[in-house]
């Protein structure tokens, strides 16, 4: 009996993508799979036909031969190593195609030992430490490779054997009606190996709890939220697998004087009324020590002064930020009688000349006066 066209079997056109061919196959395979149609010979024949068409049209070489020569190009009886046909195994083909949907499908080879877990260490620094950089000694609790069994988990002189239930895969396939579900092997608990004589130190795990001390170089310029990766310093992998990594998470404590914003530092510097009015020099703090700052006469409170290059050196670009100092005029307190008298005398000298000496205040009170006039008009 002549075979149907493979494209017709799957209900697709000749220019259909492989992805669409797979989608068509999945839809038809679900419909005609023998598990869904027990005892139905027609459904079984249809499934074989669908499976054959799928295997040809998803193999680039076989598809090219079929497109050029038709069924003769993939007929094994005509020589040339064409399509091998055969009944095949319903469970195998179904598991391969639907494995991504139902959680696994077939696995080739034995289960690989798991890589060690990554670790996180929260490191708090002062602003000075973060800006200048330093080397820190960190004590890290972790899982290390057992030195008695060298990570095998087995008693010295013995070795683990491949699990006979899952054949080293660590999982077994449980068929539940139409579906095939992968589950951890109940015999080896997902390891793929059986340890008959476990190590007396690690009790078969291959790893032991241990604390280690690491000398970690913290680069200058780090800030809160930065993370330093130390490759291979995480937990040991199981049974000789590679270790995980250690991530040092940086946070910087608040400073009593400075506030950091990126590479710039900010601070407030109090000045006296007389210094603001007459000008002069004041000392301001930096992370490198005190420096002199010249205050011009008639400086108003809140004025910002920039000290270039006195900020933070970027850990990435190596550009250096600035220190921005905001002067805040401090009202004198705890005045004695003489000081109060001098201030009254000074206040008296300003009478009638407020516009000249306090232009902002004069403008403010003029605005208030106009506001009430408009309100009452």
Swiss-Prot record:
InterPro entries assigned to the protein according to its UniProt record, in alphabetical order: DnaJ, DnaJ_C, DnaJ_domain, DnaJ_domain_CS, HSP40/DnaJ_pept-bd, HSP_DnaJ_Cys-rich_dom, HSP_DnaJ_Cys-rich_dom_sf, J_dom_sf
Cofactor(s) listed: Zn(2+)
Extent of the signal sequence: none
Binding positions (Zn(2+) 1): 146, 149, 199, 202
Main location: cytoplasm
A Gene Ontology biological process term: response to heat
Binding-site list for Zn(2+) 2: 163, 166, 185, 188
UniProt keyword annotation of ATP-binding present: no
GO MF annotation terms: ATP binding; heat shock protein binding; unfolded protein binding; zinc ion binding
Gene3D superfamilies per the UniProt record, alphabetical: DnaJ domain, Heat shock protein DnaJ, cysteine-rich domain, Urease metallochaperone UreE, N-terminal domain
Cofactor binding comment, as recorded: Binds 2 Zn(2+) ions per monomer.
Localization of this protein: Cytoplasm
GO CC terms of this entry: cytoplasm
Zinc finger (CR-type): 133-211
Start and stop residues of the CXXCXGXG motif repeats: 146-153, 163-170, 185-192, 199-206
Annotated PROSITE patterns: DNAJ_1 (PS00636), DNAJ_2 (PS50076), ZF_CR (PS51188)
Limits of the J domain: 5-70
Any single Pfam family the record assigns to this protein: DnaJ
CDD domains: DnaJ (cd06257), DnaJ_C (cd10747), DnaJ_zf (cd10719)
Chain's role: Participates actively in the response to hyperosmotic and heat shock by preventing the aggregation of stress-denatured proteins and by disaggregating proteins, also in an autonomous, DnaK-independent fashion. Unfolded proteins bind initially to DnaJ; upon interaction with the DnaJ-bound protein, DnaK hydrolyzes its bound ATP, resulting in the formation of a stable complex. GrpE releases ADP from DnaK; ATP binding to DnaK triggers the release of the substrate protein, thus completing the reaction cycle.
Domains as described in the record: The J domain is necessary and sufficient to stimulate DnaK ATPase activity. Zinc center 1 plays an important role in the autonomous, DnaK-independent chaperone activity of DnaJ. Zinc center 2 is essential for interaction with DnaK and for DnaJ activity.
Similarity comment: family membership: Belongs to the DnaJ family.
Subunit structure, interactors included: Homodimer.
Listed name of the protein: Chaperone protein DnaJ
Source species: Shewanella baltica (strain OS195)
């Amino acid at each position: 009996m002549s075979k149907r066209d493979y494209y017709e079997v799957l209900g697709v056109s000749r220019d259909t993508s492989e992805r669409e061919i797979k989608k068509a196959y999945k839809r038809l395979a679900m419909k005609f799979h023998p598990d869904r149609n027990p005892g139905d010979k027609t459904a079984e024949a249809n499934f074989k036909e669908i499976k054959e068409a799928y295997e040809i049209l998803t193999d680039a070489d076989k598809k090219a031969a079929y497109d050029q020569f038709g069924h003769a190009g993939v007929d094994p009886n005509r020589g040339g190593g064409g399509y091998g046909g055969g009944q095949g195994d319903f469970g195998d083909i179904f598991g391969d195609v639907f494995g991504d949907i139902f959680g696994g499908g077939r696995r080739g080879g034995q289960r690989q030992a798991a890589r060690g877990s990554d670790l996180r260490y929260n490191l708090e620094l002062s602003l000075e430490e973060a800006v200048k950089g330093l080397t820190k000694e960190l004590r890290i609790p972790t899982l290390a490779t057992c030195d008695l069994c060298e990570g095998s988990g087995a008693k010295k002189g013995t070795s683990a054997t491949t699990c006979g239930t899952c054949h080293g895969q660590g999982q077994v396939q449980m068929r539940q009606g139409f579906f095939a579900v992968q589950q951890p092997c109940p015999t080896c608990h997902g390891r793929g190996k059986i340890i008959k004589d476990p190590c007396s130190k690690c009790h078969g795990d291959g790893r032991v709890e241990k604390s280690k001390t690491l000398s970690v170089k913290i680069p200058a310029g780090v800030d809160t939220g930065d993370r330093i990766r130390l490759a291979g310093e995480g937990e040991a992998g199981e049974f000789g697998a590679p270790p995980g990594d250690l991530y040092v998470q940086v946070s910087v404590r608040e400073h009593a004087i400075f506030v950091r914003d990126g590479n710039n530092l900010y601070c407030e510097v109090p000045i006296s009324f007389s210094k603001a009015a007459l000008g002069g020099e004041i000392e301001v703090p930096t992370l490198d020590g005190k420096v002199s700052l010249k205050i011009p006469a008639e400086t108003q409170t809140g004025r910002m002064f920039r000290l270039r290059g006195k900020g933070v050196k970027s850990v990435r670009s190596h550009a250096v930020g600035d220190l921005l100092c905001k002067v805040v005029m401090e009202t004198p307190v705890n005045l004695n009688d003489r000081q109060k008298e001098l201030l009254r005398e000074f206040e008296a000298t300003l009478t009638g000349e407020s516009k000249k000496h306090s232009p902002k205040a004069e403008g403010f009170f003029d605005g208030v006066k106009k506001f009430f006039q408009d309100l009452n008009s």
